């Protein structure tokens, strides 16, 4: 006797009368000799059901098994028994208790089969994955990524009236539910927030606390396994991992297209549709479309991959967005994000390469506490170079333009995401040594009103995705103008990640460098500091730049410490409160109606930063054309440490505007009211100026002039004369363009 199952109910179905009669409850069921199902009450046999190859056994429901038997081959009458077990586990155990029953169990896969997610994922990997995202601290880490969270909110709210207002939205992998809240802010009627980890409980708590229980419905489960009570109009998610594809969440995001209303599903190639239908099961089908595969109209079934004879998806893609040339085709459903670009570029980083080799050199020791480690040195090198490096870097280490791999989430199939082959072709712009390939991605939210992009590029503010670099096992020296070809092949694995193969080839030679990497095992190298530019990036003396910046900062500090009492307006003292209005209207009086400056006839005031003052009676268009480029906005020289200009440059007179101050990288000119401060300790000297550094000041105009404080470094002279950074009080009330 095999394992026994208790508390079983036995019924017999009468096919002639279409009735079901109960034979007993609280029974014990066991399989004897693999051919007889014995049903007993205590020690009394209630029924023995003989099974053979002529019998049919079905899992009738979650807890019920139907056993159909007949006496001989020619007998057309089946006797059907229904066994009601105490739990689904008892049903599985019973059906697997005999080799004779196992194939019968597998005939009906409706309840015993696994989902698409389970078939492609190791159970231990799924447990770790969902446990990781169930932690509040991890959700906080993502939510505090300002670039990520704010870009999603901007994309959703910027398309609120056209894409979200009055719509039903599906949030795939909702996590804390932050994207669902954004959809509600945009006017969505209802949001289904699907979350497979235990974070679903916390998400529901936030929904209840924010009094949105009727509008945000939290569903605990995998997107591949759940059903929805209605189709949706919009799908939102944050499915990107390191190097875009890690964690294989993109496949779940694409799978969610089956929940879109039928008229919103994007068509794909017919050949893909046929291939997918061969393996199509209930998990793949839309829960709103009746299965018609057994009828003569089976080709009319609407799945998330529709027949489309003349459409070539590759021809539709332009700048990351899909444009349908045939207006009769269904409009694509809104998916945020809609498209993604993966950027791949070679890089040169001798320090990183040496760092990885340095780690492996630990295993060169022949006497580590008396133990010889050298046998593992080669294995250590292989392991360290198989790790993708997650950090950030200066774009200057890349000697070529990146290659771009585009994906459209509205049309791509799940199978296309399981194997990715990306050809590479570069034209080298700088002689360098290539140590590997760098990866980052941008995703686009293509809305009806506005397109919004989220970038993880090294030239953009840092996100929690950073960038990823894959090292080559052997460096490759390339010259300017040389071509470099290769490919990146990514194969999905059951650990929710990818096995990455990179290959670089120098055309016309035998040189070929390859490496294999495990995206599941990255090395997190980011140390919290901004990346330094690569060696050799300075085009002028860093020492001179440093001391010029220091001098400018000191002079600005002296200016801020000054407490002037009066200003001079054509010889008449005025209060500081009236200073801002001194030039309005062209006669030294405020013009409250226009709110702007009539600078054509306005008197000009300039100030020496250190010890004196300079006053001129001319108008602004005739004022200084030569201004030092070391003056920035409110924070002097902020962000200018690498591009500081030490010598003056002429500027365009027509560019002079109030409220604009020049930086070394900005052609907008500092010209807000250059003014004079009467400092008691200063002794003004009145003399005509025929020309001040080519400023073009007329010779018949008098100015108050004091010597300029300057710092000389070789042939360069850094000066702060004639340019000031006005205080907030001075700028108040002045219109800025």
From Swiss-Prot:
One of its GO terms (cellular component) is cytoplasm. Gene3D superfamilies: Hnrnp arginine n-methyltransferase1, Vaccinia Virus protein VP39. It is found in: Cytoplasm; Nucleus. Its EC number is 2.1.1.319. The active site is at residues 238, 247. Disruption phenotype: In schistosomula cultivated in vitro, RNAi-mediated knockdown of this protein has no effect on viability or analyzed phenotypes, such as movement, color, tegument integrity or area. In adult in vitro cultivated worms, knockdown causes a significant reduction of 54.9% in egg laying compared to the negative control, but has no effect in the movement of females or males during examined 7-day period. Mice infected by the knockdown schistosomula have a significant reduction in the number of eggs recovered from their livers. CDD domains: AdoMet_MTases. S-adenosyl-L-methionine binds at residues 148, 173, 195, 224. It is an enzyme of class 2 (transferase). InterPro entries: Arg_MeTrfase, PRMT_dom, SAM-dependent_MTases_sf. Coiled coil: none annotated. Residues 266-300 are annotated as: Disordered. It holds the Pfam family PrmA. GO terms for biological process: chromatin remodeling; methylation; regulation of DNA-templated transcription; reproductive structure development; S-adenosylmethionine metabolic process. GO terms for molecular function: histone H3R2 methyltransferase activity; histone methyltransferase activity; protein-arginine omega-N asymmetric methyltransferase activity; S-adenosyl-L-methionine binding. Residues 126-503 form the SAM-dependent MTase PRMT-type domain. It comes from the Eukaryota. Keywords: Chromatin regulator, Cytoplasm, Methyltransferase, Nucleus, S-adenosyl-L-methionine, Transcription, Transcription regulation, Transferase. Its main location: cytoplasm. It catalyses: L-arginyl-[protein] + 2 S-adenosyl-L-methionine = N(omega),N(omega)-dimethyl-L-arginyl-[protein] + 2 S-adenosyl-L-homocysteine + 2 H(+). Methylates (mono- and asymmetric dimethylation) the guanidino nitrogens of arginyl residues in proteins. May methylate histone H3 and activate transcription via chromatin remodeling. Involved in the development of the reproductive organs during worm maturation. Belongs to the class I-like SAM-binding methyltransferase superfamily. Protein arginine N-methyltransferase family. This is Probable histone-arginine methyltransferase CARM1. It comes from Schistosoma mansoni.
